[in-house]
Amino acid sequence: MNNIVLGIVQAVVITAVAPFFSGLGRVITAKMHNRRGPSIFQDYRDIAKLMARPESQSEDASFALRIMPPLFFAVSFMLAMGLPIFTQESPIPVFGDAITIMYSLALSRFFFALCGVDSSNAYAGVGGIRELLMSVLIEPAMLLALFAAALVCGSTDIATMGQMIASGSVDAPVAVILAGIAFCIACYMELGKLPFDQAEAEQELQEGPLAELSGPSLAIAKLAMSMKQVVVIAWFCAIFIPWGEPATLGVAAVIGALVFLVKCLIDFVIVGIISNSVSRSRFKNLGNQTWAVVGIALLAFVFVVVGV
């Protein structure tokens, strides 16, 4: 029972802080562009305004447009409940398995892309197709990096992998480092930041698959996207940067929560700086960049076999 409560608390905290971290990215962008920019809490205001506005949808749209925002939010909330964020143990282990997380993210991405294609908007349709292409290019690299780390740790459970890496009880540390590098790059691609912001390229597609959403649906979708970014970063930290998490509940869990928030703050600052230091990649060059990540993950497999 305590674990279920902890999982719910984790998900609620991530839901509460997700707009703050997305607002932090906007502030970093403004500062690097020598602009005043919005407040770091602007995303909270945007979500509140959208929730109060009426909703309008295309007459030609099917259930996919209506079901995507709550489904996207539910998947992000579920994953936040399962990851070992505040402690070393996963509150709900069935949600904290690497395979479960991959399939859950694929489900939300599929409906996110389907929402754009189904909306009868040309820009949203192109954005949805690009979102699916990004999925095809990113997921193999993610899977290979995860499986390389899972082979070394002997488990696909995120908590077990993090505990073994934190204790240094892995037989192939070089393989773990290479898998961590590949997974880190794949997670950055998953965040949809430059130079990999293809599905929502503002200059080209006008917010991509979200073009036909409005009102509460758009608010929920934007909140879910912010939550997903925090979940992806928490996923990476839980496996490859697991230090600082307590082993038990109680007061130590509060310290673990603070450590997690500090990790997220540092990661989002780094992501914001990188995103604003590069230009958007050409759509046709994405395959070459993602194959480099796959190559690093395959090299990690080689070191797993060698045992280095």
Question: Residues of each region from the PLM?
Answer:
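Alpha-helical transmembrane segments
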Residues: 6-17, 93-106, 168-190, 253-256
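Membrane-interface amphipathic/juxtamembrane segments adjacent to transmembrane helices
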Residues: 25-54
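Cytosolic juxtamembrane amphipathic/interface segments immediately preceding
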Residues: 46-64, 122-126, 209, 213-217
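Transmembrane alpha-helix boundary signature
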Residues: 58, 77-92, 112-121, 155-156, ...
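Mid-bilayer segments of alpha-helical transmembrane spans in multi-pass integral membrane proteins
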Residues: 81, 100-115, 136-149, 153
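Juxtamembrane/interfacial segments at transmembrane-helix boundaries in multi-pass membrane proteins
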Residues: 91, 149-176
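Interfacial loop-to-transmembrane junctions
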Residues: 270-297
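Juxtamembrane boundary at the C-terminal end of a transmembrane helix
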Residues: 299-308
